[in-house]
């Protein structure tokens, strides 16, 4: 008998225009890595938003979401906010949620973009250096 709370991982391989996405409830991995400027943001991000929405209904007791972005456009930023708002619902219901925004030492653009997103959502974002860029 399968576990009704089980959720298949969502794994998206990176392309030149799309980030690598790993959403794996069982292993506790929630990562967004690379560059994000998909040609059709709605088509790209809808399954991600749906997956996180389902996860929010039965989350792990602790969730760590990692962003290791090199670049993302404004459409992607809007979807990142939407995704983080779903993780925010988990926090509001009493589970632990942590967001880590990785950046290179000198990448002020990615630091500022992370701060812009942090200002919009009610999730604290921890900024963590990856080293020199």
Regions found by a protein language model. Name each.
Residues 6-9, 112-133:
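A cross-taxonomic marker for long C-terminal extensions/tails that follow the last structured domain
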Residues 48, 62-117:
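Amphipathic alpha-helical interaction surfaces in cytosolic regulatory modules
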Residues 38, 107, 133:
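Surface-exposed, flexible loop/turn segments at secondary-structure boundaries
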Residues 37-62:
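Short, well-structured hydrophobic secondary-structure segments
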Residues 3-46:
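STAS-typified acidic loop motif
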Residues 12, 38, 92, 116, ...:
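Extended interaction regions within the primary functional domain
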């Amino acid at each position: 008998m399968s576990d009704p709370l089980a959720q298949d991982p969502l794994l998206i391989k990176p392309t030149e225009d799309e980030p690598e996405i790993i959403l794996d409830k069982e292993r506790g991995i929630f990562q967004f890595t690379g560059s994000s400027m998909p040609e059709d943001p709605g088509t790209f991000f809808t399954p991600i938003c749906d997956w996180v929405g389902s996860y929010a209904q039965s989350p792990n007791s602790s969730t760590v979401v990692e962003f290791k972005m090199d670049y993302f456009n404004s459409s992607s930023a809007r979807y990142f906010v939407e995704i983080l708002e779903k993780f925010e619902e988990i926090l509001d219901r009493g589970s632990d949620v942590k967001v880590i925004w990785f950046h290179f030492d000198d990448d002020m653009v990615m630091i500022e973009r992370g701060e812009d997103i942090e200002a919009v959502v009610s999730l604290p974002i921890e900024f963590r250096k990856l080293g020199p860029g």
